[in-house]
Amino acid sequence: MSRVCYVYILLAGILHTSAQVNFRDSDSKSRQENHRPLQISLSAIEQLSNLSQTSELNEILKHLLVERVVGTQGHENVRNYIVDYMRNLNWHVELDEFVDNTPIFGKLKFANIIATLNPTAERFLVLACHYDSKYFKDQVFIGATDSAVPCAMMLDLANTMQSQLNAKRSDNSLSLQLVFFDGEEAFHQWGPKDSIYGARNLAARWEKENKLKHIDVLLLLDLLGTPDPHFYSYFKNTESWYVQLLSAEERLDQAGHLERYSYSSVTPNQQTVRYFQPHSYHAGIEDDHIPFLQRNIPILHMIPAPFPDCWHKICDDASAVDISTVQNLIKILRVFVSEYMHLNI
């Protein structure tokens, strides 16, 4: 009889705990769906714009603009540089290491880098890119836009916004997470088993660990650094957040904070060129977001259409990068992150 009572009490406790977990999950989902940006003032926009440090950005790029094929010394050096950089900013850094079969090279060891401002937070805005470069037989391919520059942008954002982000470090409701995927590039021919190695592994792992539910939005950066990129809203369920990127660009422009920018209202006689187009576009682009999209994670894809002329060509090196454009995009991201996370600027 006592054993039956014990089982009954234990079962009741489990059911009660399960109900609490389901309630918390439902409550968190509601907060994700109802989350809205907190628009910052023009003086705050100016403050964020003035955080740009071209010398520091160039120093970051110097370490990233090297060949980064998985399994090479250059790849290992870049991985260590990113890890050390984020740890020196006092972020929590985790490596998602795994081995997978590849054509040409057989088994290779991969490592996704996950840097988190506050790992105990309930929800995360995730910025992501890949840090490997494509393999070319008998040629050195740097992959400046693909994706050394996006990596540099994310590192620069974390560095230049230290003060603003540190004030949010103890917030357990919402935090910022930076993911540097490994193995995005195919070794032989793009396909479901020869591409996005890191993204496939991490999405599956986080699904198994029930961590995907903590992601509000995954903003993926790719093929960035050439002048005058055109971006579009690729996914209907994140159109409102795409509009925030577009709005950040417009407000930075109107305040005169974008460099060598030909859409500028300050110099209206120039040819009209804006980065974030007020249009949606079903591009069907395959990238690191796919395993997360398949698991119903909201995606923002900051990738230009059309792709840069140097895409997967040897000319995708430092000479393809326009630093003014890169700084402009970082400024837009600073405003977006600040407004998404309700930072006190």
Q: Residues of each region from the PLM?
A:
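Second-shell loop/turn segments in exported
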Residues: 43-51, 64-74, 100-103, 137-148, ...
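A non-catalytic alpha/beta surface segment that caps or lines the substrate-entry region
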Residues: 24, 56-120
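Structural recognition of the beta-strand scaffold that forms the well-ordered cores
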Residues: 114-116, 124-128, 177-180, 216-222, ...
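Cleavable N-terminal signal peptides of Sec/SRP-targeted secreted and luminal proteins
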Residues: 2-20
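Acidic/histidine-rich catalytic neighborhood of metal-dependent amide-processing enzymes
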Residues: 138-255
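Active-site-adjacent substrate-binding region
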Residues: 217, 224-345
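N-terminal hydrophobic or amphipathic helices/low-complexity stretches enriched
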Residues: 15-75, 117
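Solvent-exposed loop/turn segments at secondary-structure junctions
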Residues: 99-102, 119-121, 131-135, 183-187, ...
